């Protein structure tokens, strides 16, 4: 699929910039704390942590694969997040001009499929897979996953210089 309105960003730099902007606008971040309970009194949230209780008007659930635990503290409707691992291949900058825009596969029930995209730094990125896993901490890469990335990318773009994988 060709999506002319699609854009390419560096997710790391984007999130740092968003956090810096939020901080400049009064957001206070609390790191390395476990939220043990949440209670709402009127318009104020009490956030109980392993390092004390904090009061705030707004709470942002940015817990990633643990967002279900956080959500379930405050919602009657319980959810469960099944973690999913994605394998990628990152190619050297010398391969970055192999495509000039993001090429999307047809999405399936397990995700958007394998894409081929240049990065903002000039590399070429292929992936991801979307494999359900049990371990929320599971970040390992598998040979099978990398083979799936390569096969999926080759369906949409020919002659990808796979010797340039870094």
Model segments located where?
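Long, low-complexity, intrinsically disordered polar/charged segments
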Residues: 1-2, 98
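Helical element adjacent to the flavin cofactor pocket in flavoenzyme catalytic cores
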Residues: 2-58, 66
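Active-site substrate-recognition segment that forms the wall
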Residues: 37, 53, 63-166
């Amino acid at each position: 699929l060709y999506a002319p309105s699609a854009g390419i960003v560096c997710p790391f730099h984007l999130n740092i910039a968003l956090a810096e902007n939020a901080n400049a606008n009064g957001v206070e971040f609390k790191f390395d704390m476990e939220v043990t309970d949440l209670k709402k009194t009127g318009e104020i949230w009490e956030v109980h942590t392993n390092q004390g209780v904090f009061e705030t008007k707004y709470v942002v659930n940015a817990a990633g694969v643990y967002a279900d635990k956080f959500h379930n503290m405050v919602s009657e409707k319980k959810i469960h997040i099944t973690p999913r691992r994605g394998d990628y291949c990152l190619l050297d900058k010398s391969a970055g001009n192999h495509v000039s825009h993001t090429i999307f596969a047809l999405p399936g029930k397990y995700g958007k499929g394998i894409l081929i995209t240049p990065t903002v730094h000039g590399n070429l990125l292929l992936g991801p897979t979307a494999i359900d896993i049990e371990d929320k901490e599971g970040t390992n890469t598998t040979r099978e996953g990398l083979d799936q990335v390569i096969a999926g990318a080759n369906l949409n773009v020919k002659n990808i210089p796979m010797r340039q994988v870094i």
